[in-house]
Amino acid sequence: MDQPIQVNSEIGRLKTVLLHRPGEELEALTPDHMERMLFDDVPYLKEAQREHDAFADTLRENNIEVLYLDKLVAEALSTVELKWRFVIEMVRSSKQEDTYSTDAIINYLGSMDTLAMVRKIMSGVKKDEVKVIEPADKQLHHFLADDYPFYLDPMPNLYFTRDPAASIGNGLTINKMHWPARRREAIFMDYIVKHHPRFAQHKIPVWYNRPNRFSVEGGD
């Protein structure tokens, strides 16, 4: 069987590509918070989706297989145990400071259908979506953060799918992203490579992984 990853040239014939269709994570951007998310403008979702769909259709018309990030992740989380492990890792990697809110977010996400859960992690979890029982001894830093709308930040940069991972030969790098706003993106690729049936059985080499010390990102 052919290797699921085999990239030896930047100019060779493209057979398969991994994409992310812009989604609700773009609508979560606001002028007040877009700098934190590494944006300098708020994109128009419908136009972004129209342009993306035209691009994806062009790829298919040229006999290129198009894979989608959210669906691959959902397919990789094939057991209840994997699903919960993924949710816990995603939430804890978001640097939630309070145990009481962390547990509530984990339970909220874990109760969803797998694909819906993946998409919700991508689009972010707002504070008004989750019922959190606040502690009686609420500290000053809790009050200071009250005006921030998210428990779990959206991931509006996901459509740059070449940044968190790069195919090299029959393996790949799963990159440690430099900016905190993007560091959780690499977790998606980690679970796909380890657990998706298309990839897991091949024991794909990971040349560089996100726990490593130095940040690495894809380029234009």
Identify the role of each PLM range.
Residues 1-220:
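The feature marks the mature, well-folded catalytic cores of soluble enzymes
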